[in-house]
Amino acid sequence: EKRSRRCLENRMTGFKIVNLKLLVEEIGEEETKTLLSNFSCPLNEDVEEFLRIKAIEFSKQGLAQTHLIFASYRGKLTLAGYFSLANKYITVKSNIVKGKLRQRINRFAVFDQQAKSYCLSAPLIAQLGKNFAVKPSLISGDELLELACEKISTIQLDLGGKFAYLECED
């Protein structure tokens, strides 16, 4: 079976990860916006608003890349959730880290003598959201986070790196 480059079959059975930018290229912006309009996350309106309104523009500008997660529901692929990744620079003051932690950070970071801090680049999981418009839920939060982490591992296999950054709310 020949697959489009925009779609990767994931190791976790039943999920397909689709890069939003490639989806827009394939089916067009209007059809993509229609698809995204079916996403609902009443627990966090920012997560819903980002996907519906900002994700395509962020993708075009290269600020963040969004990955849509689809699962089979009643015989068709349905949007189960998404995650967005961006590149983040993390600054760690040298007086905060000691001993072995300092040695570990020193292997992966650049030390800024003037600022007396370490700077390291890490992928940021900037957005993570489940689609509550579909009952029952097609993906758990743990599965969604695992998919995002697998994607980061794949990226770091090519680019290097050992850290990831997650912004979250309880």
Residue ranges and their predicted role:
Residues E1-P136, E143-E169:
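Non-catalytic substrate-recognition and accessory regions of acyl/acetyltransferase enzymes
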